């Protein structure tokens, strides 16, 4: 009997074709270019609020920026003279897909390689400058990166210039094998010659600075600065924990941790780096 029939758990709705098309599909789309999500605090940020320095207004996280953006923030307008743009990798291993990956990175970043090198003025002080860009194959160090930085030091010796390097890297470039690892020794030898000439070398560690770059010229500066919360290390956290069989501190391999343990001289806000560089260069004799 219908009187004792169990009631349906859900309401039944009969499709009505007359309703089709009555709902507007003209929902405005928000362009991806307008907002960015902060990796640290997870807030959605209107990109214009990040400013030129690209610093999160909520938690002060420093977004990764390109070499060109770094150049704009650091040097005197119109003073940069790019050098060593004609050096090309020989692709010693004929690594499959490597040339295509290089070409894509060049098109995406507008750079010749993972490091931008040249001479520039910072508040009237002339310097030899290198800026690594993590957007170019994670700023991995191959033969071209090593050669460009080595030549920069050699030029600095000839012209009696201080060297300033913004480091960022995922390590040695695996597509070039042992040749990429040899760049560590080559650049370090150039750093030593520059030091023997009595010239100033300043490094600024940015996020991330890891692998062979950390194990060589990144940590060889006369003074070592770092941006806040930058990841700086050699091997990865999980590799170390597996090896030593211990849990590492939460802030392990952060710039602040390195400063507390004497590996970094100072943590400097991105917006203050230009003034700090100019001050340190002038204090150590300046660039002629």
Swiss-Prot record:
Q: Per its Swiss-Prot or TrEMBL entry, what cofactor is needed? A: Zn(2+)
Q: Name one GO biological process term.
A: malonyl-CoA biosynthetic process
Q: Name one Pfam family in it.
A: Carboxyl_trans
Listed pathway(s): Lipid metabolism; malonyl-CoA biosynthesis; malonyl-CoA from acetyl-CoA: step 1/1
Q: Which GO terms describe its cellular component?
A: acetyl-CoA carboxylase complex
Give, as residue ranges, the zinc fingers classified C4-type. Answer: 38-59
Q: Does the keyword Plastid apply?
A: no
Where would you find this protein in the cell?
Cytoplasm
* Catalyzed reactions per annotation: N(6)-carboxybiotinyl-L-lysyl-[protein] + acetyl-CoA = N(6)-biotinyl-L-lysyl-[protein] + malonyl-CoA
Q: How does it assemble?
A: Acetyl-CoA carboxylase is a heterohexamer composed of biotin carboxyl carrier protein (AccB), biotin carboxylase (AccC) and two subunits each of ACCase subunit alpha (AccA) and ACCase subunit beta (AccD).
Name of the protein described by the UniProt record: Acetyl-coenzyme A carboxylase carboxyl transferase subunit beta
Which species does the entry assign this protein to? Answer: Streptococcus pyogenes serotype M4 (strain MGAS10750)
């Amino acid at each position: 009997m219908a009187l004792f029939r169990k009631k349906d758990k859900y309401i039944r709705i009969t499709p009505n074709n007359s309703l089709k098309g009555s709902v507007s599909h003209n929902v405005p789309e928000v362009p991806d270019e307008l907002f960015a999500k902060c990796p640290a605090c997870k807030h959605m940020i209107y990109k214009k609020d990040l400013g030129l320095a690209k610093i999160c207004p909520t938690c002060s996280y420093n977004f990764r920026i390109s070499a060109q953006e770094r150049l704009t923030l650091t040097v005197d307008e119109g003073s940069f003279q790019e050098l060593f743009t004609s050096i090309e990798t020989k692709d010693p291993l004929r690594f499959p897909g490597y040339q295509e990956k290089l070409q894509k990175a060049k098109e995406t970043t507008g750079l010749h390689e993972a490091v931008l090198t040249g001479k520039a003025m910072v508040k009237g002080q002339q310097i030899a400058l290198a800026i690594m860009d993590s957007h170019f194959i994670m700023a991995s160090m191959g033969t071209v990166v090593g050669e460009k930085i080595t030549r920069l030091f050699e030029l600095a010796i000839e012209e009696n210039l201080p060297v300033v390097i913004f480091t960022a890297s995922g390590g040695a470039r695996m597509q070039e094998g042992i040749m990429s690892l040899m760049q560590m020794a080559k650049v370090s030898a150039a750093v030593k010659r520059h030091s023997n000439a009595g010239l100033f070398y300043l490094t600024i560690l940015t996020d991330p600075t890891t692998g062979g770059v950390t194990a060589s010229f990144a940590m060889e500066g006369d003074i070592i600065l770092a941006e806040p919360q930058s990841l700086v290390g050699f091997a990865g956290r999980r590799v170390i924990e597996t090896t030593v069989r211990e849990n590492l501190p939460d802030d392990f391999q952060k710039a602040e941790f390195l400063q507390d343990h004497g590996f970094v001289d100072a943590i400097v806000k991105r917006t203050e780096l230009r003034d700090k560089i100019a001050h340190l260069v002038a204090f150590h004799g300046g660039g002629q």
